[in-house]
Amino acid sequence: LAPNLEIGLRINPEISFLDDSRYDPCRAYSKLGAPISSVKETLVNGSPILSGLLFHNNCNSPDFQELLLTVKKLESELGCVLDNSRWINLGGGYLFDGDSVNLDSFDEAVWTLKSKHGLEVYIEPGSTFVRDAGFLVSTVLDLIENGGKAIAILDTSVNHLPESFEYDWRPDMLTDIKQGRYSYII
């Protein structure tokens, strides 16, 4: 390996907080991280090339108690791995906004990882910071009718804003008039 190269492993902490499995990175048969139960023995016995761990086990959660519970599980299952790592990435999935609760649990989780295990702690920005960070600008190319519904054909597709399809999320439209005379499917 190159001298400055660091290798991390994405783990699945196998602790779920979501009711909707579509958004649950820790659901059964998830491809989003190696399950702790599958890699625990290998990791506990040592991995000289592993620099850190990454997990992501939530989606749009305002409750940081869930993060603390995850960190406590990691400590109980992989405490010695944490002690021998340089960093940990707490992933995303938590909302840092006016609806957040148990922020003291966030502080405790980070403090535990830094002070007890000596880890550099990263957290991904999440939708709180990036959801409204930009705009998708589109032009109506054509209007058609199908089955009595007006449809606007745009110069963009769902591929440019996949969460509108994946998560059944309706983005705000700059010129949208809620009670306007016209209604279109886009």
Predicted regions, residues:
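Active-site-proximal beta-alpha core segment in soluble small-molecule metabolic enzymes
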Residues: 1-87, 99, 109, 118, ...
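Solvent-exposed alpha-helices and their adjacent loops that cap or buttress functional pockets
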Residues: 2, 24, 46-47, 89, ...
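Active-site-proximal loop/turn and secondary-structure-junction residues that shape catalytic pockets
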Residues: 11-15, 57-59, 94-96, 127-129, ...
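A broad, structure-centric signal for solvent-exposed, well-ordered loop/edge residues
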Residues: 39-41, 62, 97, 130, ...
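Conserved beta-strand positions
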Residues: 55, 90-92, 123-125
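Short glycine/threonine-rich loop-to-helix capping motif typified by GTGT followed
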Residues: 63-69, 97-108, 132-142
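Charged (often Lys/Glu-rich) extended helix/loop segments that serve as interaction or gating elements
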Residues: 109, 120-186
